[in-house]
Amino acid sequence: VIMLLIFVQRGIFPFGEETFLRTDMYHQYAPFFSEFQYKLTHGGSLLYSWDVGMGVNFSALYAYYLASPFNWLLILCPKGLVIEFMTYQIVLKIGLCGLSMAYYLRKHCRTNDFGIAFFGIFYALSGYMAAYSWNIMWLDCIILFPLIVLGLERLVKDGKGMLYCLA
């Protein structure tokens, strides 16, 4: 909800003409996402691509830029809406950042206090997120960090490593 209010205030798509396309997101990530979407919908090799630059090792590109499970939703995305997909994905990931931090705080502090939601929001809308949210592939790490810490705490305290291994 907070992100939607910011979108309205700043005129960011779908409430205006502005987008998250900045620096590398415009020059690199959007073409990578478009190529990945094309490969998913038209069946192409995920090993190599002649359509990016002068040809690239697509498996290496996938490993660094596209390996997020969220990116497989591109198979449902029409070709002309890849940039919009990326914008919605950023909003989704920022929301999941707040949710994972709130979950961590709830389990770590053993409370259901309403204030935990605020700290989840603070985490999701931190300065780092404001400055680097266009680095879409790194947002998964910000989502997983509280879960990794919680998993590590459970591993050390209780000898249970399932969450740590999954995160």
PLM feature spans:
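Transmembrane helices and adjacent periplasmic/lumenal helix-loop junctions
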Residues: 128, 135-136, 159-167
